[in-house]
Every structure is written in C-alpha cells, then in structure tokens.
Amino acid sequence: AFAASEGDTCGFPTTDQYIRIYERTGGNVSPRLASMRYGNDYYFASVYARRDSGIETLEDMNGKTWIYNETGSTSGYVLPHDVFKANGITVGGIVESGGHTNSMVALIEGQGDFCTGYGSPPLPPAEGFWAGWQWRYGMDPELWIWGKANNALYSDKKDRGMCVDLRRAVRKIYDLETVLTDIGVVMTMGPVPNDCLCFGPDFPTDIADTIVATIQDQFKDEAMKALWNDPNFYEWTAVNEITDSYYDSYRDLLGIEK
C-alpha cells in the first residue's frame, strides 16, 4: 500500500515492515514517531517453551515444532527464521497461529514445542532494592520474575517485578501465575527498534506535522495516554521523534545494506 500510494498513506508498520517499505519506495518514506513502552524504545524476539520441555538452547529446537504468528512478523518469524538459518536449525514442523496471543495459546495447549514472539524488558519491583532500576538488553529476560536459584517464581510479590512480554497477553484466558510458572523464556534475539508512525511518498508535510503534533499532545492527556497504553491497543507509553537512522541498528542486525 505504501509503495503504490499516491501520497495519502500513513501507518504504524512493524520494524521489518518499515524496512520493506523503505526498500519498495526507494527510501521515499518518512518515519516520524517511534513508540516507547515502559521507558524502552526497543523490544526483541523471544523463544518461549514449557519449562519442563527440555528446550534450553538454540540447538534443542532442532526437529521440534515451531509456533509463530505469521511470516511478516519481525519478532514472530523474520528474526527467528534468520537466526535458525544462520545456525543450521531445522524444525520438525510449523504451526502458523495468526497472531502473537494465538501463538502463546497454542504453546500452552500443546500444539507445538516452542513459540516465538515479541519480548519486552521486565519491569522492576515497585518497592525495595530494585525499585527504579532499568532493565538493559543482555540481562536475564526473567529478571525480577523467575528465581533461577530455586527454579520458581519469586514467592514474595513485593520482591517480584512485572512481566510485560507475550505471556502477559494471555492473562485474561489463563491464570498468569500458572503461565509464568509453566512457560519460560529460552533465549532472546535483538534488540529491535520499536514500531513507528510513518508517512508514505509525498504525503503532505503540513498534514503529517499536524498528525504528529496531535499524537504528541494526546500523550499529555491522561485519558488519551491510557488509551494508547492499553495492551489491547498499541501499548505505547510515550513517543519519540525519529528519522530513518533509528532503524540502522536493525539493518546491521540482519546485514541489510541501506
């Protein structure tokens, strides 16, 4: 749609979709706002599996059934597929679920051995020593959630942080405590710049500026900010102004030349 538009297209593409739009339009696309989620301008792909599955490393995924949402998804398919290919991983079967939440449901229901989807930095406990800390990529993706020493959730909820990754997406379907106990994060891939608001070829600059300013103003209004922050909507907690260079780290990650 972006490549074929006559100047009247804007949207909120995923990271990989944006890169493809850039390529299809010869760079004639303007990213203006990047999403922020809980203080982070990035996310990552995560591999999830049952903690008792025996899947603990990348090599353990050989011959197993892979659940992903759809082939256009950065975290669900594109990045994991490239990592699997680069490391000689051949899965035994695939289940295309149609959505991130569906992938986690399929994993819980035993339709596959592992699933891939978005990962998000855990949030620290609101009180105590860790309060106010900021998770950085490369740290334990289950920090403040799962105690590796005793192989269990932190029993004292005051010491436990908040899980905001794909497992949280099924909290209205399953008991989240049970999901976190049963399903773990095997590995992560990234980091990946967040999704954005961008404008297609020759989109009128004055209208684009108005849209950008309106969204920025909405984040100053508590009711509108709550709407943007809704996990069933975009789950944006803030926005940052960006240019195309914001996505250079993703190009580097996949070896894509600009």
Label each PLM-derived region with a short phrase.
Residues A1-N28, N102, P122-E127:
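Pocket-flanking alpha-helical
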Residues F2-S5, M61, A106-I108:
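Hydrophobic residues within well-ordered alpha-helices
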Residues D16-R20, E56, D60, L79-V83, ...:
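Extracytoplasmic/secreted proteins, especially bacterial periplasmic and envelope-associated proteins
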Residues N28-N40, G184-T188:
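A structural signal for short loop-to-beta-strand junctions that line the ligand-binding cleft
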Residues L33-T57, L197-F199:
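Hydrophobic/proline-rich hinge and linker segments of small-molecule sensing/allosteric domains
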Residues A49-T65, D202-T210, D217-F219:
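Hinge/capping helix and adjacent helix->loop/strand transition within the periplasmic-binding protein
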Residues S53, K64-P204:
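Pocket-lining segment of extracytoplasmic ligand-binding domains
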Residues W133-L153, K157-C163, C198-K258:
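An extracytoplasmic/periplasmic, membrane-proximal ligand-sensing/linker region
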